[in-house]
């Protein structure tokens, strides 16, 4: 690609080239990213200026001949021109605000008449030419392209629509007469008509900016804004590929900067207690980068804010990250990228923070309202000390801004790799959505209208890779809202569809709302209440500070992962006290020790073998899914839709977290769409079944399979619970559907206790190297296995030495009840039968399998039942 100066010089030389004396030499400026709305904006602006104009109609037929475009131009009503067009050079403006503007130098040379055939491309053109000066004319063209069989089928119809309108076309009525839409292409071109020797590159830039200013009066400011982002990016990114995304405008400031993560309980549990972390407050401002560049001082946020100058003498660059209050022009720094020309991005936060205070002082020296955020280094794991630290930050009343949360910053990593978490009270947990008004006449039952409300759909951004790995689909009406070009990008909008509430993207906007005309805007919203088929959302504010990011075409509100992880705090609220004491209710929080390695591998192998039996099934339900220990096995099996049910909200939140972890770190041949339902399975089957059938897309006939791994002992308290389980499985399964249970076998446990003469409240133990590895505490008196209600305490590998109580599973009684409710027994098998297969699977693990491991494993079994 040539420089603009070189292109202008080449243009001027062409007129002295004798070989081109019979050619038409054209220098044109073309805008390649023009849609109907942009076209209409420029057209109406030029008409309003009453610039002299003419309208012309033509049909151009283009035929490829040896890599050249041979054209027949029919200028209506009768003139025919034959020529070939040859491009010589081009220059493309890099800033995204230029709408793909390209300066093209080409020549047209007359050729002999040629015969048209079916390979030609036909372009019908309705062109309005505005003579803005003696040097330039601006051409706005509505184009319809036809190829192949379309030419004979549609040429006459579109000729009538574009040219033969009921009234004579003028610049003032043409747009109304044609009533153009997505059927057409739209072109804006500027052609130079002055003396070649008078043209300069500055002239080209000036006329280009003239047109762009018609589209956006702030064009020059937007260009400066983008150049400022490029300057920041040049000090953060080393990858030329990523820098190219910034230069092209595909990435804006939000995609460039490391993002603060909404902290869930599962996140916090991974590094609690947060010793070594830094804590500060979350100000209710906007993200901004303060920059000293040469003599200029500015903040890059939702737009470019000039804060002043340093005087005549240029300074070495300083770049600070922080929160900005536009109304007061106040900056509160929380990180530093560069200080007086010294790049700090590879240092840990504990080192960067020292330069942050120095950078703030530089801003203050030029009378800029700037402060460093208050940081406390957490040095104690004592919950009482932690509580005081958090309270001193969150409940401080003397800050000059409102505080809506707490920020935790990880030490030891580079700027881009520093993990920064934010905690907010549930009420202040909000999400940013791109809001679109729902298209009419979709006839989708879930989009039922509500009197006094207008239905809008909520979208967030997602990468193409994550979209595929989560097996997502576009919601009904999507293709009417977003053009094909946007859907084919690597990052695009998708409806907000969290695993526990797939219809959360429906928003009924009150007609009486003070927020009007919200279509196409980014809104900050909070969840007020979850109704049966939609969420009652509340608008907090319109994110005017995100409108510029939206224009890049690479921002659509929160990222999908960020949005769903933030949403988890509605599912599983995270209290302020838990910051100090640690998250409560963490599901089986203890870790397994190394002595369980072989036995755990054996159980995993068996569950993998069982789940492979349902590979590629469409809908599978997991009862008591917990935190998703088997999620990877379902993904490996290629299950298309998985519904996980559990009463533990924290466990389900961890499952959703794992969903993203699997999608980003593991390779699976097939994608699985994951749904979770917070539900106590001891509640009436009818109520549970209704909730499952309300899941968006769940088939009326039911699921293909139900799986429950090591869970049903919780439902063996009484006969009513077992009956309820059988009824539930019958309601949720399609005819011929299968139930797959793994469980501790009550008869095997009782036999073990009898053999070892374990009485009431006594404990059977299996030791390894003097360490209790497995244990069962007898909590019942009866000598024979009862149908239900016999309780034991079990020492689990992840229970940190504590016994978990559960009921013995009388498998004969369980099978009897299921047969009574329309099921047939397919298979019942002990886990010990898989041990020989495990040996073939992994000889190394089999060798370290102890007798205690084998004894413990033999207590478990597998039951398969089929719905008649």
UniProtKB/Swiss-Prot annotation:
Compartments, as annotated in UniProt: Virion
Domain of life: Viruses
Principal location class: virion
Annotated site residue numbers, mRNA cap binding: 627, 658, 713, 806
Pfam families given in the database record: mRNA_G-N7_MeTrfase
Pathway it works in: mRNA processing; mRNA capping
Its EC number(s): 3.6.1.74, 2.7.7.50, 2.1.1.56
Positions annotated as active site in the UniProt record: 282 (n6-gmp-lysine intermediate)
UniProt GO MF annotations: GTP binding; mRNA 5'-cap (guanine-N7-)-methyltransferase activity; mRNA 5'-triphosphate monophosphatase activity; mRNA guanylyltransferase activity; polynucleotide 5'-phosphatase activity; RNA binding
CDD domains, sorted: AdoMet_MTases
Entry keyword set: Early protein, GTP-binding, Hydrolase, Methyltransferase, mRNA capping, mRNA processing, Nucleotide-binding, Nucleotidyltransferase, RNA-binding, S-adenosyl-L-methionine, Transferase, Virion
Reaction equation(s) it catalyzes: a 5'-end triphospho-ribonucleoside in mRNA + H2O = a 5'-end diphospho-ribonucleoside in mRNA + phosphate + H(+); a 5'-end diphospho-ribonucleoside in mRNA + GTP + H(+) = a 5'-end (5'-triphosphoguanosine)-ribonucleoside in mRNA + diphosphate; a 5'-end (5'-triphosphoguanosine)-ribonucleoside in mRNA + S-adenosyl-L-methionine = a 5'-end (N(7)-methyl 5'-triphosphoguanosine)-ribonucleoside in mRNA + S-adenosyl-L-homocysteine
Positions of S-adenosyl-L-methionine binding: 607, 624, 646, 710-712
InterPro entries per UniProt: CYTH-like_dom_sf, mRNA_G-N7_MeTrfase_dom, RG7MT1, SAM-dependent_MTases_sf
Induction: Expressed in the early phase of the viral replicative cycle.
Domain mRNA cap 0 methyltransferase residue range list: 594-868
Assembly notes: Part of the viral DNA-directed RNA polymerase that consists of 8 polII-like subunits (RPB1, RPB2, RPB3, RPB5, RPB6, RPB7, RPB9, RPB10), a capping enzyme and a termination factor.
Domain notes: The N-terminus contains the mRNA 5'-triphosphatase domain, the central part contains the mRNA guanylyltransferase, and C-terminus contains the methyltransferase domain.
Stated role: Probably catalyzes the second reaction in the mRNA cap formation pathway. Forms a covalent complex with GTP.
Family: In the N-terminal section; belongs to the dsDNA virus mRNA guanylyltransferase family. In the C-terminal section; belongs to the class I-like SAM-binding methyltransferase superfamily. mRNA cap 0 methyltransferase family.
Name the UniProt record assigns to this protein: mRNA-capping enzyme
